[in-house]
Regions:
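Conserved functional hotspots at enzyme active or ligand-binding sites that engage polyanionic ligands
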Residues: 1-111
């Protein structure tokens, strides 16, 4: 697989993990640009879960799409997409990507 693009939905291993972090092989949304991903070999990703809890940092994926569930925008991780055997699933809708980036930005910006 070549470097994933921002907005790509990929399969990726989140193991090892610690505490309340998501674990196992699961879908994720890539939020970093492909230029970064290809040069560094890492990608900033948010895991996706099918267990909707109604938390404010969950972003729902549209029903009927290739991946069901919610993107966990508050669980941003930097992972080696090659060693974790990333596989492209599809691209997320632009509205989902924009909302996730907005929430990640809110977490990282000054109060």
């Amino acid at each position: 697989m070549r470097a994933p693009e921002r907005g790509a939905l990929i399969w990726l291993s989140f193991t090892p993990q610690s505490g309340r972090e998501q674990a196992g092989r699961r879908p994720a949304l890539v939020v970093s640009p492909s230029t970064y991903n290809s040069k560094v070999g890492l990608a900033l990703v948010c895991p996706i879960t099918s267990r909707v809890k109604g938390y404010p940092f969950e972003v729902a994926l549209p029903e009927g799409g290739p991946v069901q569930g919610v993107v966990l925008a508050d669980q941003l991780r930097s992972l080696d997409w090659r060693s974790r055997e990333a596989e492209l699933i599809a691209n997320a809708p632009i509205a989902v990507v924009e909302r996730v980036l907005q929430l990640v930005g809110a977490l990282l910006s000054s109060p």
